[in-house]
């Protein structure tokens, strides 16, 4: 996609996000659906779309670590833990951090932590940079159906009018690995 078309798609996606709606976009492995993490209305729309209970918690993806800092508590990290995390980012590894009390429950669910990732997908990086904050991100698929890997699959599952940022996935076969930021415990193999 040339830069003008990509810029137009990102600008259109930001308009949708500002309307507290959900968008789809390519990530490292599959298409994701996401929304503004600061909008309870938008997050509830995403959860309803996915038929996902709010208590499960969600993942935020960002262009850089600074975008994630308002949502996580990294004060307990040692230098070694920080080094481990930053050696994986940007990339397809999600880390679960303690969350401060100010992080909304519609993001953390029943947990006192939040899963976050600094993406290396160039289109998602550009989207988060243009939006100025991270996005809630979960796989683009309706309950019981496989995750979408193309724009056509997104449209088949969510409808022709669903807002999609066109592009290619990063080609990974598996979803992101998920690890505990403090202990390194593996929650999901990537």
UniProtKB/Swiss-Prot annotation:
GO terms for cellular component: cytoplasm
Cell location: Cytoplasm
Gene3D superfamilies in the cross-refs: DHBP synthase
Catalyzed reactions: L-threonine + hydrogencarbonate + ATP = L-threonylcarbamoyladenylate + diphosphate + H2O
Ranges for domain YrdC-like: 7-190
GO MF entries: ATP binding; double-stranded RNA binding; L-threonylcarbamoyladenylate synthase; tRNA binding
Pfam families documented for this protein: Sua5_yciO_yrdC
EC number: 2.7.7.87
GO biological process, one term: tRNA threonylcarbamoyladenosine modification
Record keywords: ATP-binding, Cytoplasm, Nucleotide-binding, Nucleotidyltransferase, Transferase, tRNA processing
UniProt key word Manganese: no
InterPro entries from the UniProt entry: DHBP_synth_RibB-like_a/b_dom, Sua5-like_dom, TC-AMP_synthase, TC-AMP_synthase_SUA5
HAMAP family in UniProt: TsaC
Assigned protein family: Belongs to the SUA5 family. TsaC subfamily.
Function: Required for the formation of a threonylcarbamoyl group on adenosine at position 37 (t(6)A37) in tRNAs that read codons beginning with adenine. Catalyzes the conversion of L-threonine, HCO(3)(-)/CO(2) and ATP to give threonylcarbamoyl-AMP (TC-AMP) as the acyladenylate intermediate, with the release of diphosphate.
Protein name as it appears in the record: Threonylcarbamoyl-AMP synthase
């Amino acid at each position: 996609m040339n830069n003008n078309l990509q810029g137009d798609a990102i600008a259109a996606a930001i308009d949708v996000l500002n309307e507290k709606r959900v968008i789809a976009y390519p990530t490292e492995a599959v298409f994701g659906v996401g929304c503004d993490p600061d909008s309870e209305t938008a997050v509830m729309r995403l959860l309803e779309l996915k038929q996902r209970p709010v208590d499960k918690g969600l993942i935020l993806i960002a262009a850089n670590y600074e975008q994630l800092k308002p949502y996580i508590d990294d004060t307990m990290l040692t230098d070694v833990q920080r080094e481990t995390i930053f050696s994986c980012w940007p990339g397809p590894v999600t880390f679960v951090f303690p969350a401060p009390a100010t992080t909304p429950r519609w993001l953390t669910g029943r947990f006192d932590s939040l899963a976050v990732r600094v993406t290396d997908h160039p289109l998602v990086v550009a989207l988060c940079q243009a939006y100025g904050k991270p996005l809630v991100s979960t796989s683009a698929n309706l309950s019981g159906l496989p995750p979408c890997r193309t724009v056509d699959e997104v449209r088949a599952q969510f409808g022709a009018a669903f807002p999609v940022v066109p592009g290619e996935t990063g080609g990974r076969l598996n979803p992101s690995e998920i690890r505990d930021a403090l202990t390194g415990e593996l929650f999901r193999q990537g």
